[in-house]
Amino acid sequence: MSDPLYIFNRSQSEIVVESLLASSNLRSSMPTQQIQSLRVFVATWNVGGKSPHSGLNLDALLHVHSEFDVYVLGFQEIVPLNAGNVLVLGDNEPAAKWLAMINQSLNKSSSSSGGRLSPKTPSFGAGSMFFAKPSLKKISESFRTECRRKLKICNCSTFSEDIVRKYGRESCFRCPEGLVNQSGVLSDDEEDEDDDDDDEDEDEGGGKVASLVSNQMTMKYGLVASKQMVGIFLTVWMRKELIQHVSHLRISSVTRGIMGCLGNKGCIAVSLQLYKTSFCFICSHLASGEREGDERRRNLDVIEILKNTSFPRICRTSFTRVPDRITKHDRVIWLGDLNYRIALSYSETKTLLDKNAWDTLLNKDQLKIERDAGRVFKGWHEGKIFFAPTYKYSYNSDAYAGDTSKEKKNKRRTPAWCDRILWHGDGIRQLSYVRGESRFSDHRPVCSVFVVDVEVCEGKTGTRRQ
């Protein structure tokens, strides 16, 4: 008679073997990982509290003919930093205008669009939305309507039995109630937390806003995220076909203004996952001042931003790594008016500027000094600077403030590279680091182009960019 224990062990072994074979077959049919390269355009611009006017054209700033995969655009001082905007209700009309102008540049009709017309954008003439007080919420929704339908909160896969049975179908779980619908995508009634004050009845500009996107299917770029905190404004755009591969989109902000708690200084951070790679984009405006020791206040701002920026977990799968801190992301780009100055007097700086003595000036750059000493941005990277200091210019002029006899001495500021772009993590290669020459503000915009490696699943749709 057979040994019952032997029969039991034999049965268990068969089960184990069958399970291993099934697991092996599953792994062999799973998509393999591959690396694709995407081109990311990043720009930062302190616009000096000025709202965009009808004559401002962003085409040159955004290098629209180069057709990047991702645009990360950060602004500072989009509103005047007065008590009304800082202490009371913020003004989001300028942010709405900036969004409209960005969309106008990115989605205008071009020969590369195959002859299709891009969505209508505001004509900044009489009767346009520039005179109808545009709503940031309405414009954001217009630019996100089609893209939001595709934007998944969570697209993580799991090896649980129900997923094994359904393998081959796209995995996308429901996340926190109220954020997503049954299909796991952003619901159309989601409210932007910074737009709660925009629920007023539709004004005469409503029709203009509605007409901004007459045919969403023809949009080349879609708005992925935008957030305003007083004068800081961060917006992220992507090629439309990429947006369906975005998940875990989260936004965080840290205030570092007066007494460390007002939003006139601080940062906005956007976290997202593109395919299988996590990204974090930070737009900041740090403490101002060119007195000795002010650089330590800026260092503290950076330290507190890194410490206090956190992102909520919105992934249903418990084993999935969803980064909750800035430096835990695979690819991180930090942009903004960092406000670091040159540790020289005005006259010494001007003398070196006149001689184009960039290396000597850069050796006195506070950010370089603080980084080299390991006091701030340890482990971060910045490209070589080959452009003139970006601050402070006289308005509508190529002269630095204080250069002309008409300007009072108290308006003089030592020229400095206040506006910077840094990055953290592997798989990021900088192709260019330049400044723009718009005279719109007392700052010059700064732009950078990166080639970023993204881990994708073979078989997923996406375009390789070199």
UniProtKB/Swiss-Prot annotation:
Ranges of biased composition (kind: Acidic residues): 187-204
Superkingdom of this protein's organism: Eukaryota
Family: Belongs to the inositol polyphosphate 5-phosphatase family.
Species annotation: Arabidopsis thaliana (Mouse-ear cress)
Alphabetical list of InterPro entries matching this protein: Endo/exonu/phosph_ase_sf, IP5P_plant, IPPc
Known EC number: 3.1.3.-
GO MF annotation, one: inositol-polyphosphate 5-phosphatase activity
Name of the featured protein: Type I inositol polyphosphate 5-phosphatase 10
Alphabetically ordered keywords of this record: Hydrolase
Location of the region described as Disordered in the Swiss-Prot/TrEMBL record: 183-209
Residues covered by region (Catalytic 2): 411-426
Region (Catalytic 1): 330-345
GO biological process, one term: phosphatidylinositol dephosphorylation
Higher taxonomy: Eukaryota, Viridiplantae, Streptophyta, Embryophyta, Tracheophyta
